[in-house]
């Protein structure tokens, strides 16, 4: 039967899309990120990067359209979306700024998929503060300072992965399919329960 869904029996399926963030996804950091990218790669480099990310989203959209999904049994998990009760409002706001990621979420929600708060708010605040510090201060000259900053960033990423995986473990029900949009640096697979079958429609760049 068409649209039967990917999760059958007592299994749970997670469709995992490693994503690249656009400037529209950056919120208050948008201008700082654009400025830092311009300084690093120039206007031509920024244009190439923007086009490459745009192509990634075109491929993600096409991959989802090709999947045999029953959207009334689909849950959406999103990088950077806190468990807060305002999840839909946040997605709408970012979609209106031009985020293809969040525009896609709205389209899937309109088809019946359920949007899930995915991240722990305090961890996202720490991530934002660390990113802002990195973007607004000069690169540390001392190797030790740079190493400490990298270690903090990596530890925070691991804590976020653990929370996201726990959220999926607890909310994705038997017979359901989850769609996860998560930045390419993340690696939460080892934190997922063994009955969650992970599928990568696009190449997992690891």
What function would you assign to each model-found segment?
Residues 1-206:
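Compositional signal for N-terminal targeting/processing segments
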């Amino acid at each position: 039967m068409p649209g039967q869904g990917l999760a059958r029996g007592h299994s749970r399926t997670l469709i995992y899309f490693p994503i690249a963030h656009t400037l529209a996804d950056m919120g208050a950091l948008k201008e700082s990120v654009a400025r830092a990218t311009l300084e690093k790669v120039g206007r031509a480099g920024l244009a190439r990067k923007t086009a490459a990310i745009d192509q990634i989203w075109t491929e993600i959209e096409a991959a989802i359209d090709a999947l045999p999904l029953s959207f009334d049994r689909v849950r959406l998990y999103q990088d950077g979306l806190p468990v807060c009760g305002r999840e839909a409002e946040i997605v709408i706001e970012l979609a209106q700024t031009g985020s293809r990621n969040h525009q896609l979420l709205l389209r899937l929600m309109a088809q019946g998929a359920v949007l899930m708060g995915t991240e722990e708010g305090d961890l996202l605040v720490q991530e934002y503060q660390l990113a802002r510090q990195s973007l607004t201060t000069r690169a540390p000259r001392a190797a030790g300072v740079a190493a400490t900053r990298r270690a903090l960033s990596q530890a925070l990423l691991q804590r976020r992965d653990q929370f996201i995986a726990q959220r999926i473990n607890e909310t994705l029900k038997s017979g359901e399919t989850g769609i996860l949009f998560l930045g390419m640096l993340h690696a939460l697979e080892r934190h997922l329960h063994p009955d969650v079958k992970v599928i990568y429609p696009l190449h997992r760049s690891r």
